[in-house]
């Protein structure tokens, strides 16, 4: 049995719980920093700059067909920090939590708006990850929030990118996290955090 090894290169350091990386055509990487509350960009020199200070807990991100970045904002966490500030993990809903939302960000100017914060008057609790379909609309997971003695049951949504329609497609779903579409878009894939499963 042979072991394949590849060299890895560190592109940036000091990021505050990065997720949702997007490789851009110019070689830069756009990602969210959940603990920092930002949508950030790492240029080809490895320098990090803030595109937008979104607040809460920006989680997953995807570039839409209009060139805007669509961000799942989970509303924020309380954090446990260990190993001399070298390791941090989310543990509970933030004390300043005011709800989850889908945000639309102009990656050139940093201007942003809230596209959705509810579905038929049911609040979004903790939007987590997002994927666009060929029609230019998107699917996203809502993992929910964890509190000291209870946690939400999550859901999967489909929404129009122009802000005109959102549908709850599957609920309940325990801790839906990553989401993706097959190339022919006949299959939707969802990762479940708590159970360690892929559906």
Label the model's feature ranges:
Residues 1-199:
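Sequence-structural signature of mature extracellular/luminal beta-sheet repeat domains
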């Amino acid at each position: 049995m042979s072991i394949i090894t590849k060299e890895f290169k560190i592109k940036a350091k000091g990021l505050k719980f990065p997720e949702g990386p997007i490789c851009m055509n110019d070689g830069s990487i756009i990602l969210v920093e959940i603990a920092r509350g930002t949508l950030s960009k790492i240029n080809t020199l490895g320098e990090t700059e803030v595109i937008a200070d979104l607040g809460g807990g920006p989680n997953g991100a995807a570039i839409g067909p209009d060139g805007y970045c669509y961000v799942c904002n989970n509303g924020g966490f309380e954090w446990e920090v260990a190993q001399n500030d070298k390791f941090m993990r989310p543990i509970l809903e933030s004390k300043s939590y005011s709800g989850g939302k889908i945000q639309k960000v102009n990656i050139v100017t940093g201007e942003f708006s809230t596209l959705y914060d509810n579905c038929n008057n049911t609040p979004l609790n903790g939007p987590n990850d997002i994927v666009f379909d060929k029609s230019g609309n998107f699917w996203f997971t809502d993992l929910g929030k964890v509190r000291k003695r209870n946690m939400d049951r999550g859901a999967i949504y489909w929404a129009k990118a122009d802000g005109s329609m959102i549908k709850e497609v599957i609920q309940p779903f325990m801790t839906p996290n990553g989401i993706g579409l097959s190339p022919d878009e006949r299959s939707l894939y969802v990762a479940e955090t708590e159970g360690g499963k892929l559906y």
